[in-house]
Amino acid sequence: MSARENILAKLKKADALPMEEPAVFDYYREMGISWGSEVERLKHWAAAMRAVKTEIYWVTKTSWPQVFRQAAEGKGLKNILLPLATEHGQIARAALVDSNIEPIAFEREIDTWKTEFFSNIDAGFSSSQCGIARTGTLMLFSSPEEPRTLSLVPPVHFCLFDTAKMYNEFHNAVEGEKLVENGIPTNVFLISGPSKTADIQLTLAYGAHGPRDLVILAILPDHISPADLEENA
């Protein structure tokens, strides 16, 4: 028996006790950050995102289509890519009726119109899964209806976010969305602002590796008014 085999044999015979699973979520529940109210938490999230050039519009379930149209027209868009297989995609298309913005369905295989997609599409529109207050972040799930390219390639990304799905921290989002129990989707991504990069001279540039503009339509619950958030938000 070689020295290696001898060592392995001794290890196998040893009375090894199973290691106790660390109480990760209990630790973060105890040590995690919290805010005095929903409004304060939303203000913190908004301040973190606006600090990196994110545009946020506080909207309601009924007002977001109108605000979406106004924001899109304000950017002078010629077209916008919509996930028409979703309810919010259909609502967004209806909001653009009689406007100068052409709604384009995201329904073709990317290889069949790659040149047009990368060269001629002004904006994309998607939903989000949830938000993370501490870091000023949105979590998005890629799906056949809303693939990653919908929010990555166009220079402007409109994102619809239901603030009822706001979590304090990342671990709260993992727990609340049951990512452990249900399995994490193959493509989950966290967005904290438009694409940005810096060269060796530390010159900050937006849009180098993704959208240069991120516009969030943040849907508020009925008991919170947009006016509650605009002051110092």
Where are the language model's segments positioned?
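The feature marks the mature, well-folded catalytic cores of soluble enzymes
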Residues: 1-233
